[in-house]
Amino acid sequence: MQQKPSRPVKATLRTRQPLDSEESDLQPDSNAADSSTSSSAQLLALLSRLFAPLRRSPNFSATLQHVKGLLYDQQYLAAFGTESEEGERWREVYAARWVPSRAVIYQRIFDECDIAQHLGWQTPSGETNGGGGGERPRSEEEELEQERERAKLRRRLRQEGKSADEISQAVAELEQQFRAARSSKADSKGEGAAAVVDAIMIGAGAGSEVVALGAVLGVAAAGRASSGDADPTLAAAEYRPPPRVRVHAVDQGSWDVLLDKMAQGLRDAWPTLDSEHVEEDGGDQQQPRFDVRFVKGNILDNKMITTAAGSSSPVIDFGSSSLRLITICFTITELLLQSRLETLRLLSTISRSAPSGTLFLIVESASLAQIPIGQEGRTYPLGRLLDHALCGGGDKGGGGGGGVWEILKSEDAKWYRMPNDADEVYNAMGKGTKVKLENSRVVLRLYRKR
């Protein structure tokens, strides 16, 4: 299951102007947009260093055409699963061509969804705590409930004759209780040492979402350091380093070698992602703070997500207490076309198993967002199908989800455009085949487990 293709680096990038068919209100012109384009430049520079030797190869274009032919003929296992030196080259050429634009898009989406904050690598605005397990985002329902609690408290204190200063102090203490409650739901186990959180990325073999997540965390950690959030003089009770993040990239192809290269490139670019001393099995060991683990297999195979005889946990454990994030990027339509029944069963398993507070991000190309239903040529919008499977229908419907998910973000046709200088940044490392980075219009859903 794979996402299929539909000079010195500059410090900042400008975003391409929209085409006539694109939505003009998506033009980033704020400080946040400047920050986003700068971090995109860092990510593209990393990928440029990684793939430049490959693009300079005289056989790059011919190999790329061969890979395109395999994809056109839907020979995905041949393109991505051939166990040979030639097969490894096919995978690298595919990644060099399509990963950069996908990674930039996913990086922006992760930023928009506050994934770094959710994983404990970025503190909420205005706070200087060291982080730890992080604070989960609030839904509109929670915000309304908390505002009702504040209003109720103010009303009661006024009736008791309290002064304005006393009321303000009481409301501030209530706000601290709200933050503590949110953080406790996101924190994983462990005291003193950094916690461990897990992210399961389905269909992530080529690594677009993996490098995007690594870049988002690396930039967030650098921001914490520059703002003083990581001040070692803070009391131990106040400061905790960001948790180790274990990424489980699940795919049918043989992507382990390429993912190892990408993970090492991320750790070289952002040393905060590199190893740390942790106590495991009674000894002190070095473990990457950003740990990428490849899991080969078909996620629709029931053996992947159920506990085998003699095993304490399944290959992919959606019920792990340390699970914080699940992603399915540019893969969900392929799964549904492969088997709608098995895909809905997978969503049901995730819904039953995932711990409360887990974020579930699904992204798909808007051009693939009409799912065929039945034999009459009818189609059904992907976003509506996902919402019904995960959020609607109660215990009797919704693909078994029982309404256990709430929608935090919903887009049915949002454009993500490459910065103007993206091609120049990515193609900057010497001569070779020039790669054109492409805009994408996507369907996006961000859910949170209740």
Q: What are these model-derived regions, one by one?
A:
Residues 203-205, 251:
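Conserved S-adenosyl-L-methionine
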Residues 65-77:
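Phospho-regulated, Ser/Thr/Pro-rich intrinsically disordered or coiled-coil terminal scaffolds
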Residues 199-201:
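Class I SAM-dependent methyltransferase core
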Residues 70, 97, 109-112, 216, ...:
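Alpha-helical recognition domains of nuclear gene-regulatory proteins
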Residues 207, 212, 379:
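C-terminal His-loop and adjacent cap/lid subdomain of alpha/beta-hydrolase
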Residues 2-10, 16-59, 136, 149-158, ...:
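Domain-level detector for long C-terminal conserved domains
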Residues 77-130, 134-196, 208, 215:
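Class I SAM-dependent methyltransferase Rossmann-like catalytic core
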Residues 212-221:
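Histidine-anchored nucleotide/phosphate-binding helix
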